[in-house]
Every structure is written in structure tokens, then in C-alpha cells.
Amino acid sequence: MALNAGSLAADLANRRELAPFWLVTGSEDLLMLESADLLRRRARELGYTDRQVLELSASADWSQLPDAAASIGMFDDKKFLEVRLPSGRPGIKGNKALPEFVERPVDGVVTLFTMPRPDWQGQKAAWWQALVKAATVVECDPVERAQLPQWLAGRMRANGQTAARDVLEAFADLVEGNLLAAKQEVGK
């Protein structure tokens, strides 16, 4: 299942349980950060109180991934495991470990993978195909210029503000391509 970052909050609000695997990926850092925050918050609301973060690289020891999933805290029965792949490539060890991991979900464990979207070659790799097949994918792509005024209006509404269409258009011209700057300006 694939969602875009803009529809994630509504989707999570309707879920009584989270899927075992989530993948937040794309090229828009702000949307990736906010999507991961939404997933963390919803997991906490649903009782996933044990949280562990792994940052894995191509040279990492990938055996820690299944070990981390298997080790739930003594006083917890649900775990939120966050796996960050900053390079977007798992390397040779991860190429093997990742598909094996997503084939066997661990009961009571939700795993969130965050990474930039791989290039076209990476998207053909078996590890990527296995991850996309097993996970609920949250696509975090840049907001197109045509949708930017609407995106800004939504941000302003959430902040208790309004603006006329021409103001939103001018605002969009100023921040085009930089959603973080747009978020900061709306927050002022």
C-alpha cells in the first residue's frame, strides 16, 4: 500500500493497529521528518512504548536488525523499531538481511524504515522490491509549484491563519522548493 505524506495523518487516525512495516521515503526532508513523527506519535497512542532506533549503513552489522526486533522490553509488549538508512543503500550484507527481515514480521513489533528513495537501479534491487512489497509506503516528494499555494493554505489553517489567494501565490513564489522555509514563515 502506498500513501503520500499529505494523506498519512488521516490514514493513521482511522487505524486501530499499525501495519508491521512502514517505509518513509522520498526527496523532501521536511515531509519525511513529519511523516516519521506522525507514525511515532500514533504508535505511542496505540501502546508501542518500547522504542529503539538503529542507524544502518552499507558497512553496518545487519544482524542487529532481527535482534532488535526480537528484544522487547521486560515491561512492554509492543515495540516501535525505527531503522534509518541515511544513504538509501543497505550494502551487501543489508541486501540479504533486509528481504529476510521483512518476510517474517515479529508479533507486537512495528518497524519504520526511513531513507531517501534510491535511484532507478536501486529501485530494481531485490531488497527494495521486498521492502516495498511488505511495507506501507509513505511517499515524500516535493510539493509541485501548482499545489504549493494549497499546501501553504493548509499549513496556515492548521496554524490558525488565513491568506488571500494572491498572497498565497506570492508566498509560493518566495519559498518554492524549500518547504522548511515555508514552514518557518508560516510559524512566524
Give names to the regions the model predicted.
Residues M1-K188:
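Conserved beta/loop motifs at nucleotide-recognition and modification sites
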